[in-house]
Amino acid sequence: MACSVDTLAPFLGPNTTNAVAAASYICNQFSGVSDRFVDTGYAIDSTYLLFSAYLVFSMQLGFAMLLAGSVRNTMNIMLTNVLDAAAGGLFYYLFGFAFALGGPSNGFIGRHFFGLKEIPSNSFDYMNFLYQWAFAIAAAGITSGSIAERTQFVAYLIYSSFLTGFVYPVVSHWFWTPDGWASPTNSNLLFGSGVIDFAGSGVVHMVGGIAGFYGALIEGPRIGRYDHTGRSVALRGHSASLVVLGTFLLWFGWYGFNPGSFNKILVTYGASGGYYGQWSAVGRTAVTTTLAGCTAALTTLFGKRILSGHWNVTDVCNGLLGGFAAITAGCSVVEPWAAIICGFVAALVLIGFNMLAEKFKYDDPLEAAQLHGGCGAWGIIFTGLFAKGEFVDQVYPGKPGRPHGLFMGGGGKLLGAHIIQILVIIGWVSATMGPLFYILHKFKLLRISSEDEMAGMDLTRHGGFAYYHEEDPKLGMQMRRIEPTTST
């Protein structure tokens, strides 16, 4: 709203000089107040994005607990989670943020903001880096689960740095920046719609899952995972309690992952001052996220009960996370009832891919490739089917009436764009992470020796087990410091 001296002065009285002076004073004051409101709006949006970044970062603790509970080598897997965050932070600062969001640029890769040079800018501030970094290390954390318990430490360092510094940022540039060739905010939309991968079923989950697939495939299964007849042998993790704790921490963090991807909350839809705005869409996104995860958890519970004959808490946790991974693409543009469909099918996808993994003797300790890669791909297809036109126009304004979900009367163009997204992500990650893992394998930098693997990486590579147990029954469980010994 603007204040005009010429418009306001006639209402202040017949004395023209005083009226003009008074109007000028009032308009100046009004302008100052208006500027403060603008500043307040920026502050609210910045606080919202920062809080969302903190939630997404807390997912690293969830990953750590989930991984620690699902495997036997606790010290090793905890160290790799810390490494993912630390190495990812440095390399995303140096290169990743620039490759992802460094516009103006071409449709393939960004070329500004290396080392956060020229930040803050008109487009981005420091909180954007923090939020995007949290996403990048989430992708690296997904990959670490697939290659757990048999991978050398140097391999973790190399793949994590490469994934967060180059592979993931390029994909996020394609789909999340105005310059990206398939972005829904590009001036030249792919198939007239662009790709709607709102919070990253493809950008984050498929990238991390496919990278993990190649790592686990090239390494081969863990020793003892299949017996001499080829029959599957369950290598259970050491703590179901940590699995459940990690799952709930990830659930909590997902409320920053999906709703936080709006980046702003103080946006009105329609006339200013209405009760319906982006804050409502944020709430709807949290609801769709919740419903998809809950439905997937229950479907997996009963599905696995039918197949295996027992109730398994780990299966339920993985099903829940599979539902979250699937809804991440379309969480902001689908109705709550559609999220239930998303979660139901995501559970079936997860169960189906796990059966294929067993058949082909593929060993992924966390089911990360099946969960994040498979369910992420389904989430992209789901969005192409169920994205609602009204919600799409609100979340991606500027080009009303663009193609939306096939089952919602929006035609098949969005679905076609999403199929292309799946194919290019598979191709890109295959062309980058596949050769990287193969080179590490050829140089004997990928897998540990069979002796170390059988003895346990915690003992052979990390100085001892994560837990100390005193064999004397009178002492029970206790913790103590173990001093290093020197050989004579």
UniProtKB/Swiss-Prot annotation:
GO terms for cellular component: plasma membrane. Coiled coil: none annotated. InterPro entries: Ammonium/urea_transptr (IPR029020), Ammonium_transpt (IPR001905), Ammonium_transpt_CS (IPR018047), NH4_transpt_AmtB-like_dom (IPR024041). Its main location: membrane. The keyword Membrane applies. One of its GO terms (molecular function) is ammonium channel activity. Root hairs and leaves. Keywords: Ammonia transport, Membrane, Transmembrane, Transmembrane helix, Transport. It is a multi-pass membrane protein. It holds the Pfam family Ammonium_transp. One of its GO terms (biological process) is ammonium homeostasis. It is found in: Membrane. Induction: By nitrogen deprivation. It comes from the Eukaryota. Belongs to the ammonia transporter channel (TC 1.A.11.2) family. Ammonium transporter that may be involved in ammonium uptake from the soil. This is Ammonium transporter 1 member 1. It comes from Solanum lycopersicum.
